[in-house]
Every structure is written in C-alpha cells, then in structure tokens.
Curated annotation (Swiss-Prot):
GO terms for molecular function: 4 iron, 4 sulfur cluster binding; ATP binding; ATP hydrolysis activity; DNA binding; DNA helicase activity; DNA polymerase binding; metal ion binding. This is Regulator of telomere elongation helicase 1. A motif (Nuclear localization signal) lies at residues 151-167, 883-889. ATP binds at S42, P43, T44, G45, T46, G47, K48, T49. Gene3D superfamilies: 1.20.1160.20, P-loop containing nucleotide triphosphate hydrolases. Belongs to the helicase family. RAD3/XPD subfamily. The keyword Transport does not apply. Residues 852-866 have a biased composition (Basic and acidic residues). It catalyses: ATP + H2O = ADP + phosphate + H(+). Coiled coil: none annotated. It is found in: Nucleus. The gene is rtel1. Residues 7-302 form the Helicase ATP-binding domain. The keyword ATP-binding applies.
Amino acid sequence: MPVIKLKGINVDFPFTPYPCQEDYMSKVIECLQKKVNGVLESPTGTGKTLCLLCSTLAWRDHFKDTISARKITERMGGAELFADRPMSSWGTAATDGDTPTYYTDIPKIIYASRTHSQLTQVVNELKNTSYRPKICVLGSREQLCINQEVMRHESNHIKVHMCRAKVSSRSCIFYNNVDEKSTDKEIVNSILDVEDLVKTGKKQRVCPYYLSRSLKQHADVIFMPYNYLLDPKSRRAHNIELKGAVVIFDEAHNVEKMCEESTSFDLTPHDLISAIEAVDRLLREQASDISKADSAEDFNVESLNSGLKMDITTIAKVKQILMDLETAINDFEMPANNQGITKPGSFIFELFEMANVNSKTKTETVEAMEQITGYLAGRPGVFLNTSGLQKVADIIQLVFVAEPAEGSKKSQTGNSLKEFKVHIHPDNSNFKKKQITDVWASSSTKKQGNVLSYWCFSPGFSMQELLRQEVRCIILTSGTLSPLSSFTCEMQIPFPVSLENPHVIQRDQIFVSIIEKGPDGVQLSTAFDRRFVPENMSSMGNTLVNLSRVVPHGLLVFFPSYPVMDKTLEFWRAKGHADRIENVKPMFVEPRGKGTFTEVIDGYYGKVDDPNSSGGSFFAVCRGKASEGLDFADTYGRGVVITGLPFPPRMDPRVVLKMQYLDEMCRNKISGVKYLTGQEWYRQQASRAVNQAIGRVIRHREDYGAIFLCDHRFKSADARNQLPSWVRPYVKIYDGFGTMVRDVAQFFRTAQKTRPVPVKKGKAEGHENQADTRLLNTGSSCLTKSVWPSDIYQKAKTLDAHVPSLKRRKLDSEEHSGREGAARLCIQYEMEMTSKRKPVSLLDALDDTTDKEEREDTMVGEERASHLSTLSLQHDKRLDDESRGGKRKIKVVQERETVTSHTAKTGKAFMMELRRCLSHENFKLIMEALQSYKTADNLNNLLATVAEPLIQDHNTHSLLRGLYQFIRPHHKKEYDERCLELTGEGCGYKQEHSLSREEKEALRHNSVKAEIPPVNPPIEQLNSSRLLNQGGSHLGTIQLNGGEVNVRSEEQKPQTSIKEGPSCSSLLSDIKQAIGAEKTRQMFSALQAYKTSNNYEQMVSTVVSLLTERDEDIALLERLSVLIRPQHRKQFGELLKSLTGNDSAVVQDSDIGSSQQLSYLEERLNARYRPSFHECC
C-alpha cells in the first residue's frame, strides 16, 4: 500500500489518493494534533470513511511511537538505538505542547454513526486497510442478545429487565461464559461487526452483548450509534469514558436533530394511564395476598414473592406519584385556540414537585419504578403493559440528569435551562381512554388528557456536555453538511478546522437544472398556497412524463412530505399522468412503515435491472428512509427530481417555539456566540433535506446523473447558495423546457458513450441481502462498484398499498396474457382472483365464508402496509421459502396464478408472525377467541379478548388490524371503527367489504354481461408504436356501423415521412386540434423563422416544448420530421429516439424537399388564415 506523509504523519492508504482525499486527511490530522474540533464535508463517493479511518489510526500509531521513543531515550541515556534512524523521527506528533508519558495516555477513538448498518459498512472498510487495531462495536440487546427466553418478549424494556434478572441470578449460560471468552485472542484481535459478534456468540456460546462491553475496556476504537453518546442515560448505562478520547461523528447531518431529541420527551395520557394500571394491578395482587394471610404474626411482605423486594406502602406511594403527576398535567385549562400553554424550561421542576418528585426523592422513585417493571416483566402469565411505567422512570432520570443529590433550587432554575421549553397541549390522538371503575385508579378519566412536552431547542446543549467530559476533540463529518456556517452555529461549540471538499467527478458526469416552468408554461411551486392547485400538479406531472422519457434506467422523485406526495399521486392517477409515467417507467412508492420498504425497493431494483424494461421510477419523500441512507449508484439513480422545498410544518408548536427561541437568542446577543435567526434556521432545514436527497445519486468516481430542481424558488440566489459546494458550479437555469430536454438528452448520450458500463455481478454473487446492503452508505471509497440485485419481481406488487387512490385497472383481458409476467407484476396495483382453493390453514378455515378475493380487497391503503409489515418477509427468508418448492413456490406464469399463490400464503404468514410476536399464552388466547368467533359469530366477545394483548404495545397494533382479513363481511365496518378507536388507525374499510361472497359473484356476473365484446380481431387494434411490456394503453378507437366504440384511446401510429404535399394540410389540422390555435401560431412562427434563418436550435426548443405535453402529441412531433432540412435530420432523429425510446423513430428523406414542404405549408396557412402567414391561427 502507498505511504503518504501528511503533517509529519505516515499514512498507509490502499491506493494513491486523490488531492481531495489528501486534503481531507490533512484536516483530520490537524484536528487531532492541535486538539481542536473540526467539521468536514466530503461528498459521497470521495472515500470519506476510508480517509477518516486511515488518517486517525495513522496519527494514533504515531502518538504511540512518541511514547515508545521517549521511554527508549530514557533507558539509552540519550544514545541512538539505530544510527540511520534517530529516535526524534519515531514520533513527534505531540505538536500541541504535550509530551505523553504513559501508554494509558493514548487516546481511544470513539467512532459514532447513525445506525448499525452504517457502522457495519465502516467496519468492513477497516478490514480493507493495513491497520489492525483492537475494536469493539456496542449495540443494544435487541441486536446482540441470543437468549431465546429473553428475545421472545415484544417490548425492548422487558428484554432489558429479563436480561438483568438472568444476569443477577447467573441463570444465563451465555453470560456465564463472558469472563472466559473475553480474553480469547482470536476474539480480541478480530475485527467483528454486530453480525460477526452474534455469529461468534452462537458458535462460542457466549453473550455478544456483554462480550462487547468487556472488549470495550481494552479497545483502541469503539464503534457505536451516536445516540449512545448524546443520550446521557445511554452514555451512563454503557459506561462510556470520554476523558481524553477522540470523538468522531460520521453521517453527522442528523446530529443536530439527535442532540435535541436525546434530551426531549413527550408524556401522553396513555403513558400515564398504562403506568397507573400496571402499578394498580400489582397493588391489588399484593393486597389480596395480605388478606389471605392466616395471621398477622405469620405475615411477611417480602415472603409473598421473592422477586419483589418492596413493601405494599412503597407500591402505593409510586401509584400516588403517578396520579398526582397526571392531575398536575391535566389541571391546566387550555386556551380557546387549543394551541396549548408554553412555560420556561425550569417549570418542569415545579411540575414534578407537585407529584413529590425532586432531587432528593428522584433516586428512590426511579428505583421503585424499575423494580416494579422488572418484576412484572419477568412474571409468567398474562402480559401486562409496563412501557408507560418505564417511560416515566426514564423521564425522571432525564429531567434530573444534571442535578446533584442535594441540588439547590438555584441550580435547577439556572441559566442552563434556557435551551428548554415546557409545552402542555391537548391530546389529539385517536386513543380512547379506557373507563376505569375504581375511582382511585385514575384521577381524570372523564376529561380529555393533556400531553406534557419538554423540548430542547439547542443541539449545543449536548455538544457542550461532551466538551465538559474533557474529550480531546470532536470531528463532525458527512457528505451533506451544507450550509456549513449555519450548521456550526447550531452546534454552539468552536470549529477552528473546516472543509468543504469538491467531488472527484468530471464536468461531463453531472447535469443540474432548475426547472421554473413545466412544458405547458405553468410555474412549478410547492408553496403552501400552490401545492394542490390542479394546474400546478398537472404541470408537474407533465414535467415528470417528459423527464422519464429522457432519463435512462432509474429515476428518483422526492416530494416535500407524505401528504403532498399522496395527494399529488392521487391527482395524477385520476388525470392520467401516472399511467403515462407507468408506460415508460413503472412507479414504486416509498411506504411509511418499515415492514414493506425492503419489498418495494427490491421491486424497483429488479425493474431497473430488467433488460426488457426502460427502467423504473421511485417516489419518496425528503427526510424519509430512501433520502437518508439508501444507495442509488449507477443505473439505480441516473436522475433525481426534487419537486419542491421541504420546509418544516410552519404552524407546528415545536417549530414555532424553536424559531422564537432562536430569535430571542439573537436579540440577547451573547458575546462571542453566534446564533441563527428563526427564519434562517427554517430555510436551512429545507436546504439540508434537499441536499441529502441530491446525495442519493453520483455515488462514486465513475458514476453520472442528472439533478432536476422543479420549483421556481430554487432560482433565488439564497436557495442556490445553500446547495452543496460540489453542485453549485454546474447549476443552470433554462428559459425553455424544450431546451432543457434537448440538453439533458445530449448529456446522457455522451455519458453512455464515454463512461464505462457498470459491472453487473452474477446472480449468486450479488443476491444475498441486497436490500440491506444498499441501506449502507456505500461509496466511501472512490473505487466503489455497484452491486446489482437479482430479479425479484413478485415483491413489487405491494408498491402502492400506501396510497389508497393508486389502484391500477384490472388486467383481465385476454390480450394481456401474452405479456411478460414479471413486468406486469411490477406495475400492478390491484388484481382480481378467480381460482378457488380449500382453506390451507386454521385462519383460512375460521373465515371460510369470505373468499380470498375479499381478503385482498379488505387490505387497502395504510392497512395493507400495516398488514404486510407484520409478515416480516425479509429478502433472505423469501428466497429460502421459494426455493423449497411445494405450496410456497410462486411460479410466474400468468398473473392470476401468482396472485392466488401469494394470497394463499397470507393467512399462514400472518399466523407465523402472530406466534412470533406474542407470548405462548397470548397466542393461545387469541386462537381460542377466533375459534369461538367462528362458531358464535359474536364480534364483541372477540374484541374483548384480542384487544387486551394487542393494544398494550404500539408495535402490536398492526396485528390487531391484521385480524381484519378474518372478520366476516357484516362485521367489517364495526371492526374497522373499533380499531380506529383503539389504535388510532383504521383497517381501510370500503363499502364493498360488507358484501357477501354471493353478492360479489352476482355483481361480477352482471359486469361481465355488460362488457362489449371485441368487434375486430385484436391484431387490428394493436398500436405497434408502443411495446406491450411497457404497461401503457394500446387499443385504438374503432368505428362500427357509423358509430364510435371507444375501447382504449391511443394515438395514431407515428409517420416518419410525408410524401404528398396535401399531407401538410392534414398535419396542420391535426396540430391545431391537438394543441389549440394559440400554440399552433407559436409553433408555425418558429417553423417560418427556421425556414428563413436555418436556426435549428431555436426552432426545436419551441416545437419540442409544445408537442411533449401529452403522450399522444409525440406522433405529431415525429410527423414534423418531414419539415427538417437534411443537414439537421440525424440530430432530430436522435432527439426523437431519446423522447420515445423507439429505435424505429428514424427520420427518412422525403420525396419533396423540406423547403418545398415548408412553402406548401405556408401557402395552406395563408389560404386558411388571412392576411399573412405570421398572423395564422
């Protein structure tokens, strides 16, 4: 490996670095040597992670050599150990004036990133270097525990208490082996990520969680998610020592948000009620046991249950605290506008004082709550929700985290809480409070509860806390930190070292365009007053239709928010824009839930990889999962469209208070401290979200792509200045849409000719965990190559379950049977099922009165997303199941068989998920309730039984909604309403769900009778100008007995040459009919100018913009080719090819010269529209 010398440090690097990489490593070393903080931005694909690791570890080795040289010098009495290498050259890293003396002075490196998947990628990069430090990766029990008795529980806090109980009693065989295995050299000297730790733990029968904590003591580099550092409770729980450590935050664009959220909370009425109920249940049991005692002499409270070491009075005190806290919160009268009440941060202590919780009582209160939680969590029998009680205990610790045991009033209300606000507002959730008959069980069951919010508005609060721990330095780095000035202001700590690195790509690899107006001339905007205007949404749809034609392979489209995306897609479906996009690039929509994300993204990847497809389009939101961590390298992201500026919700109380806080800080103007104004922060939030979405494309040095900013507000200098520094030089604003289309088509033609084709990995090689690996931030080395997935088409069927209105027309015509099944699977939204099968599982049998078609129809909208999320159909598991054959095998032959096969599996898959998520007792309880419902047909009894175990934990709400598929038709509406009351979300009920199977059959039979039979052979109706596998409409309009039968409207077959003069008359008539008189006048003015000036560029930009607003007008553009002069025809033909994707769209020489055609056309115009050609139309 090459050795590069930077600032006196020899850095081993895997290859010769680029100048931008050397600059980056120099800045890192400068921070380490001078003990100063740094903020470093380097675009994805520039090898940021590799540079960070190599420079940091090289400096650490040099630091260690400094100590070695000093010790040897002392022993040698000043003599040189090697004549040709003076000891002064061994290590002179201490340029900060310090002279390290002991090896214990060597700083630990704490490397934090947002998620474990990103940390896994970093660890894999470390394996590619020559450095072999001792490392450990810290994770939660959720990721690392291998004890099945603990992992079978639903809630994370229950797993924590179960684990602690087993550890304290030494009943966990895996924990008992930790001491022995933690010194194993094979483990200590290996570089293990989370997955490797789990594999090692299972193989060696040692607990990975406690093994990682043991390895931490002697590790040189400690990897962890950055909430472990920023959350004081987590930092204390993991015993993270920060003094003298180097702290690195990778992917730091989220640090600002995490800093605020780690010290904030929202306490809802539901949390308090569930906490009171849990303590009340225990109190009743203990009181009952006392009453059963034979005599007072024989009574011993602790002997009632050896697991609970507290008396009944302590339990009663805890309950009283909870009730007093609930009363204190709910006693506030809300203002008429229902906006809530805001208090200073110090008010939180007054509020808790009302419940007798203060700095003196906090410790015993928290210990009592955690002991109760631990006891209830480990108790066998019916599950009792203790999440609310655990949350209250965590909140008390958070509020009093900085308070000493004997804290004074002054310390509580001092200047340190200026960053916090207390906000009390009505609970507007759909959670319906359960009525409690015991008057002592809740103090406010008759009134709507209030939510207590305690919000931090300064990320600098957490950053300053890290500095108080005496860290050596803090380095923040990411691919998108721009604008840097506002970012550093928010952190409120000094950053003497900063860097905005350029990209390693060349000019011909990036195309950036600000699109102010759509092809129809309507200004594009997602401002609050414009976002849902029909003309605006239509223009945006037309823009995307055109871009989908010229951008090859994968196209990414980002919306400002989910509501904007949902309403826009609904409009496009109703008006036909979505169908036109589908014809070129099948649409895949980012789901809100986590469960189906892998399914949808795999479908998108598979469609892009399909050699018979023109690619796919992926619709997502800024700040969503796809915009944050997904890799769309190479063909998966050739273009990214930003449909607007994603400003935060302006009237949200937290946003309003944040802006007020910043404005207040600016007015007070503390010397030496710079604050953003509220408006600057508001704009920065939108800019940073845009920059993060832009970063999804151009992921390595050979990648290329286009960025389209589709909002007129991007034209402002302020908006452009907040774009990443590597993007700003290439931004171009176009006056005409047609000119932009021409340039981007030329850009991709050039790039495809000059850039190497991405290396596609084989099916076996690139198949495993493809979706998970793309969640990692690949491209950390500029040698990154894309990983191509295998074709996984059947998963894409769920892509639009998340937008209720997006349901594609049923493809039940015989003409579709010859179409490629895989392509149809990717674009289908809804399908009719016709094959009848016997019930294949118990749950199928329970609802034998409802056929499988109804099951598919009942799961619509958000409910289908929730249902699928419970199936946990991870990529590997699906592959394994399908490879076994039998009834689980999906044979992609024709659509009906595939859908039937999938639906037959849903009952069994749901049953498996129910069994996996619930305890054995609760699963058995629900199955008995379903059997009873089958025989008694009593919905109330069913709900009374199944609701209790399924509504306690938010994670199991989707299971309650998932049972909707087994509810009989006459109960579906009521069940949907009850689910809405209990979980805040319905099941997607539609009126047709209440129809019985017989009623549905009758409706279907009547609709079949009403259908018009084909009047001509199918071959006569097919339009050969569009490939059938592109998913578009393809049947034309036919005449029958003088009347018109509209089968499926479609444009005429394009003509490539016009040999007769009179054809110009027909062309003129067709154009005027298609685009109207005004636009026809504009077009022929441009053609007349072309005839006289021979200015092809000016003519084509006008003509293309006018004739690409609708799909059917493309044929007219092709017919205009006869008017193009010979020297321009090749160029015009390439433009047509890029717009249509049709190789046959080649401009032929006509028998009549183009000048003659233009003259003839002018004559026709003069004859029809007097007085002159220029005043035509």
